[in-house]
Regions:
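Short, structured coil segments at secondary-structure junctions
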Residues: 246-247, 290-291, 314, 318
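ADP-ribose/adenylate-binding Rossmann-like module
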Residues: 269, 274-277, 281, 285-310
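Conserved SAM-binding strand-loop segment of SAM-dependent methyltransferases
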Residues: 249-254
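Adenosine-phosphate binding glycine-rich loop
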Residues: 297-368
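Segments forming oxygen-rich coordination pockets for charged ligands
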Residues: 1-236, 240-247, 265-269, 310, ...
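Short amphipathic alpha-helix with an adjacent loop that forms part of the alpha/beta core around
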Residues: 256-266
Length: 368
């Protein structure tokens, strides 16, 4: 199932004229399945998009959504699992979850969802700002809007005439600074002109580039699709990267030496797995000028050294996390196991903003 906000909005945009309701977690105390800022949509027939729990709250939320749609009033709902004697909703997380339910109306410009959908479709990131209005107040008084980030993740480093040109090392430092700032973005309450707002960080789905469209790339693309990521497979060879083998991916048949940097700067991660030294060399050369957060090269260490030698590159020439041999040592040798190990590492690097191998220990912890 697709649960990324953009996937929800894609489905909503097919029938925006229906009477929908939006539910958002405004705060959490203790443990919960989803955190503050998680969004879910309900249509008048009971169809749901997204999830706010592991399934224990959705049936009751559907009832509140129907009531909100009929009355056009805002509802604030609290689910308290801290009381072990209260088995009303069979919550197992032991936390307290506060949720706001709001009907989407023409009067509230559908809480700015059309603009939010457009911005995420374009690959932009920023904050979705929702006013926190009182319980039972009219939904027409609500507001929601998208606010773009000041610095895009993949902005190129173009020095002005008044500044010294950026060296490779200084560009790398700026990239890390920007990603650290991005990593600090969390859902929070803000007060503007006396009005409380919920500010939710939003971004397009992660974009994975797979360089090499062989059989072992198929499970990599399939797992990434399950994560709701965007996928592009790069392979100019006629017998590789066939669209029916990669139904969830975009296929790019442009030769690697002819790829434009702009085609690659929108990627968040790249896995190089052509099983061909020259093609892997060309892929690394194409990726080196970018600020991609995660790059993995399939194959053992001695093969990595050969590819680096052909490309006249080293690991230090890449600004993001470079993994070679690719992935975590999870065990297994089949393509699906290799894909799992690579995407597990990639997922951790992207979500935890890990910049070097020494920081991988941050992945070895229990989820909280």
């Amino acid at each position: 199932m697709a649960h990324h906000l953009l996937s929800l909005l894609d489905s909503w945009a097919e029938k925006p004229q229906l009477e929908w309701a939006l539910a958002v977690i405004t705060s959490v105390e203790g443990s919960s399945y989803r955190k503050a800022g998680a969004i879910m949509l309900f249509d008048p027939l009971g169809k749901t998009l997204g999830m706010l729990s592991g399934g224990c709250l959705e049936a009751d939320l559907r009832r509140h959504a129907q009531d909100a749609i009929q009355t056009q009033r805002i509802a604030h709902i609290t689910y308290d699992a801290t009381d072990e004697n209260d088995t009303s909703y069979q919550l197992g997380c032991g936390g307290l979850v506060n949720i706001m339910m709001v009907p989407l109306l023409a009067d509230n410009q559908y809480l700015g969802l059309p603009e939010l959908h457009q911005q995420l479709t374009r690959g932009n990131q920023g904050h979705y700002q929702l006013s926190l209005n009182d319980h039972k107040s009219h939904a027409g008084e609500m507001s929601g809007k998208f606010i773009a980030s000041n610095a895009a993740k993949h902005d190129s480093f173009e020095p002005s005439s008044k500044t010294q040109p950026l060296t490779k090392q200084s560009a790398k430092q700026v990239t890390k600074q920007l990603t650290k700032q991005s990593a600090k973005q969390i859902t929070k309450r803000v007060v503007l002109d006396g009005q409380d707002y919920l500010s939710v960080p939003v971004r397009a789905p992660y974009h994975l580039g797979i360089f090499g469209g062989g059989l072992d790339a198929q499970p990599l693309a399939a797992i990434a699709a399950e994560l709701d990521w965007k996928i592009t497979v790069f392979d100019s060879r006629s017998a590789y990267a066939r669209s029916y083998d990669f139904p969830a991916a975009k296929i790019n048949k442009t030769p690697l030496t002819q790829l434009k940097t702009e085609e690659l700067t929108q990627l968040d991660a790249a896995v190089v797995m052509n099983h061909n030294l020259d093609l892997d060399c060309d892929a690394l050369k194409a990726l080196q000028p970018t600020n991609i957060d995660y790059i993995a090269l399939l194959g053992p260490g001695h093969r990595r050294d050969k590819v680096f030698g052909l490309a006249e590159l080293t690991e230090q020439d890449f600004s993001g996390f470079f993994s070679a041999p690719a992935g975590l040592a999870l065990g297994g040798e089949l393509p699906s196991s290799v894909a799992l190990s690579i995407l597990s590492q990639c997922h951790g690097v992207l979500h935890h903003r890990i910049g070097k191998q020494a920081e991988l220990s941050r992945l070895d912890k229990v989820m909280s």
